Structure formats: C-alpha cells, structure tokens
C-alpha cells in the first residue's frame, strides 16, 4: 500500500491537460459580450476517479486519458500566486490510512476523512470555530502580513499576461470560508444567533484581500476575480437571499469595486447546485460569471440567458449525465443548449462537472464530434 503524505496526492491521478487555444483578449471580449467571433468550448474538470481506468480498458489513447487528444477552444488561466485566505496553515498530517479511506489533520487544523474510492473532497469530522472566542484565536491567520506576497509573484503575473493567459486572482468564498471554519449547520445558526461572528470573519477576510489585491493591481492588471463557494445542493442554496444581502454581498462588493476600478472585467463564482434563488443578489454584488451551471440541479443556461441577458456569463452548462444515455439523448441536449448560447456569446460551453463513471469512451468521442458540428453550423450564421 502506497502511503501518501498529502491529501492532494490522492487526487493527482485526476489531472488533465489544459491547453491554450485563444488569447486572453478574445476570451474577455466574448465573456463580456463585446464580441462574438467563434464559440468557446472546454472540459472544466475532467473525469471522476476510476473513469480513466475504464477508458483505458476501452482502448483510449494516452491523449484521450489526459484529454489532450480532444478538440476544445478555450483560454489558459494564469493565477497570480498570492495568498488572500488562510495564512500560516497548520501542518497537514496523515493520521490513519486504509485501502478505502484516509483520515488526516488538514491545514485548518480539522480532522477530515477522504474516500479513496471516489473523487470526493475530504469531509471534515470537526471544525475549529464555534464561538467568537474560537475565531479570535484563529483570526491572526486571516490578517494581513507581508508574506502573503512572498515569492516572485510579479514575474509570474507578467509572464501570464505576456503569454496571453487570462490573469486571475482568487479570494476566499463569502459562504465557503466561514463554512470551512464552522461547518454548514453551525454557520446556518450563526447567521441568526451570532451574526457579529460571521460579520467579523468576512470583514477580516475582506480587509486582507483588499490590501493584497491593492498591491497586486498596482503592478499588473488582473483580468478576472475568482471565488469558490460550492454553496448549493439540488434543492437550493445553503444561504438564502437575505443572508447573501446581509453578509456576503458587502464582502463581494468591497473586493470587486477595487478590482473593477483597476481594470478587471470578470468576477466569476464556482458553485455547484441550484443557485437560482440567489442569482439576483450576487449580480447586485458585482458577480458577472457563474459556473459550472449544473442542469441536474435546475441550472438551465438557456432559460437563464433569456432571463439575465448580458448581465451574466456562463461556463459549463451541458449535462454530464446525458453522456451515459443514448446518442439521440446526447444530440438532444446539445441541440437545446448550443445554438442559443452560440448566438448570444458570453459562454464557454462544457460539461457541468466531472465526467461520471460509466461514461463510455465512444460516447465522449461522439459528444465532442457532435458538439463541434453544431457549434460550427451555428457559428457560420453569426
């Protein structure tokens, strides 16, 4: 049995090739509805754990295994390596490992359990913050310090820009970071019972993010602000419109106003699940890009484009589960989604999350071929 030293090692086998087919300028113009030259198409996440082995048994080439053999049309994203979140993290430690799972101490100091049989995130078994006193003991991990800009981040940012990459910076999630510290249930209660705790967490994170990004954007322009939330299930978001308006939106606006003033054009949020109930609140907070737009949770990019028009761009939106269906079902999904999004622009089409196990390699090949047939047919009409 191989012993892994870091939790990330268990996910290394899922890595896929990400190529660059267009430069940053075309992506930014496309996603802000300034120009619509040709469709954009990508694979956002790649396969679930075990699918590469399934495809290898079905005769996949090495290029199909790492996704480099398939035709896409997408930019390459270049993150600026600065830290706006947890600093001076706890040392990660593997506490227990079996053939089925691993228990570890993660960088938040939590005990977490990670399944080795499925591509899941490590699930926390405890959380460090229950009260304001708990938070105050951890708060220094989120306050500004000069080592947040350690390393040659300026050189990396300039190289990304010169290479035509989309220059990005990431900030902690306004829902996700308190959830990482408290857990979903405790955070839901804290919105009502300890609002000052949630406000202080987000005020602290926001202050640090603004201080870091102020220095970054004085040196190099940033194209896209990125935030990871994963704050919804199929039935809806874990924070409602009121919580977004009261707690999360002020944090978003504070960071986005700085970034927008310095030339950033996109503010993108990564969240699975049904986000319909809070889209309006996030748009008011500055968001203008959402992904991966999960159809099984009710995120229909066709109807959302009709509702929001050019206020909201998308990435993803094609139902990953349909690839396990029939060729006719795949075509029906593509014919419904692709034509209106090619006509309107503002979308990088792709599957809404990892390719599920049981997806035949032949079906993925067919999906790529048919998607391009439809995209090229529609692009000829632009």
Show the residue positions of the predicted features.
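Active-site loop segments of alpha/beta catalytic cores
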Residues: 3-46, 51-57, 102-105, 114-118, ...
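Segments that shape or occlude catalytic/ligand-binding pockets
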Residues: 51-92
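Short, surface-exposed linear segments at secondary-structure transitions and domain or protein termini
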Residues: 120-132
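A structural signal for short, hydrophobic beta-strand segments that form beta-sheets
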Residues: 92-96, 119
